[in-house]
């Protein structure tokens, strides 16, 4: 099993979710609003004629746990749906998951994901 963590632009979330809706390769998703700074180093905004620097930029973090054989498919959907080619598009991280246990039934491993 793998943990896919994607950090994307907030305006790309609908496209990512629409892409993921067309697959049965995952059963659950966690979506979090976050703030972050990367290569972009913040943005300059104006309010009432005054300019100010925003060091932390709003992003969305998506977490999914998937079977090993579904990692490439899910990663491609997220990548294709969220890429604009501009700085600040985000990142996708993939981690190994030792085990998963469904609390309700006690099922573990891949059985806990379905």
Task: Give the role of each language-model region.
Residues 1-114:
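Positively charged, small/polar-rich N-terminal and surface patches that mediate targeting and assembly
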